[in-house]
Amino acid sequence: VGDNWDPRLDNFAPNELSGQPEKIRQWAIEFMKTTARAAQLLGVKVVTCFLGSPIWAMWYSFPQTTPEMVEAGFQKIRELWTPIFDVYDECGVRLALEVHPTEIAFDYWSTKRLLETLDYRPTLGINFDPSHLLWQGVTPHLFLQDFIDRVYHVHMKDAAVTLDGRSGLLGSHIDFGDLRRGWNFRSLGHGGVDFEEIIRVLNAAGYDGPLSVEWEDSGMDRVEGATEAAAFVRKVDFKPSTFKFDDAISNK
């Protein structure tokens, strides 16, 4: 919906729309509206999504990018998505945006700006995925703590930063899984995400939604990895305490 077209977007749309950017956009808008109605019929309360970004190519601010250009990008997202949000409101369904590179909200401050642009409309919340924050240098559980009231869904996904003096954070146009990269996604528990701190923040907030395993470790067998990841989530997902440790000696 919100992206500027390039040939890769043809892969998401019907074949007959290939190379027709505005027709693809309109198809995507109607698809998202239909998804809201389908979710309502199925009793689904949250749909995860991407919004896209018309300004992702400006993330580096060179060639020179003006504040007005960036603001226009955020306003374009508001313009394109408001009619979609209206349908979700009518259906009693909420959207959860995965904060993710290439999206209008990809880190802490861009997420804050998006929510402000949308006047903190409750229709749109966050699909929290720590793996995309870790390699950017954002501490996942602190992001979670600050945006916890907007977290509607949680991805359990790990990543490892392996900078070695030659590699960088931008991927080097090298495929995921290649050991020359400066970071890669890892099976749960094999990366740098502190999931215990994440669970503690979720428990403190009373989050009772899904912990959805997203598994993308190119260096591990999928069946072994998925089995191990499921066990990892069960282990780390401890229940919150129902009392304080010193309640027995309170003055009440």
What is the predicted function of each stretch?
Residues 212-222:
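A short, acidic, flexible beta-alpha connecting loop/helix-capping segment that sits on the rim
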